[in-house]
């Protein structure tokens, strides 16, 4: 079967669609209200059909969003500010691990597609991401970094993440370092396909 290295499958219906498309394993990088975790557990228990799901129960970043705070209220003091500092990021990583995470997702750069964010701008620092990598490694897990921007991607690679997700503005120097370290690159090309010319360059 196919492996979808970057997906957002949060329901049995979505899981079934993926399976019918030939996907037998998918990494679900980010969850909303534990829906992906629940779907994963239903599949593993044999209650519903679907691919094997490897789930990150959240997306650790300075402004993780309302859903994160509702699932992890212990970080509520940051709801009007930012989740910052290596120890706080390590704590957030432990919280995701306690939810039976298969992988940890961190934000190395801001999100794309929103008027309020600049995807080229770095988010978590190298030290903060290294704290997540260290905590994940204690449980035999790895970290995937959402990284559009050049600086954020470079920070994430130096921090020791296993994979760079998106990598829109990643430069040759960082790609060379990724090759040296064995860091995987997941370019998520399907994200861009709806924005392209469906006819291609016919000339």
Spell out what each predicted region is.
Residues 140, 146-149, 153:
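Aromatic-lined carbohydrate-recognition surfaces of secreted/lumenal glycan-active proteins
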Residues 1-17:
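Di-metal (Zn2+ and/or Mg2+/Mn2+) metal-binding site signature of metallo-dependent hydrolases
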Residues 3-5, 25-29, 142-144, 162-165:
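Short catalytic-loop micro-motif centered on adjacent basic/acidic residues
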Residues 15-141, 174-201:
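Divalent-metal coordination cores built from histidine and acidic residues
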Residues 100, 154-174:
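Structural recognition of alpha->loop->beta junctions
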Residues 7-10, 30-34, 148-150, 166-171:
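Short beta->alpha connector loops
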Residues 108, 147, 165-168, 187-189:
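Active-site proximal loops enriched in glycine and acidic residues that flank catalytic Cys/His/Asp
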Residues 167, 202-203:
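A general structural motif
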């Amino acid at each position: 079967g196919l492996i979808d290295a970057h997906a957002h499958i949060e329901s049995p219906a979505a899981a079934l669609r993926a399976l019918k498309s030939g996907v037998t394993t998918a990494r679900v990088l980010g969850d909303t209200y534990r829906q992906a975790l629940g779907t994963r557990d239903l599949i593993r228990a044999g209650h519903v059909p679907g691919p094997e799901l490897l789930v990150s129960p959240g997306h650790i970043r300075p402004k993780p969003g309302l859903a994160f705070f509702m699932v992890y209220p212990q970080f509520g003091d940051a709801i009007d500010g930012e989740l910052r500092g290596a120890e706080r990021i390590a704590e957030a990583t432990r919280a995701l691990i306690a939810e039976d995470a298969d992988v940890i997702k961190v934000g190395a750069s801001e999100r794309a597609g929103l008027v309020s964010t600049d995807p080229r701008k770095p988010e978590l620092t190298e030290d903060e991401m290294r704290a997540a990598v260290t905590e994940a490694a204690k449980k035999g897990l790895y970290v995937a970094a959402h990284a559009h921007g050049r600086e954020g991607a470079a920070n994430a690679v130096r921090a020791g993440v296993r994979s760079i997700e998106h990598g829109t503005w990643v430069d040759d120097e960082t790609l060379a370092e990724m090759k040296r370290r064995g860091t995987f690159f997941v370019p998520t090309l399907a994200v861009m396909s709806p924005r392209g010319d469906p006819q291609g360059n016919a000339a």
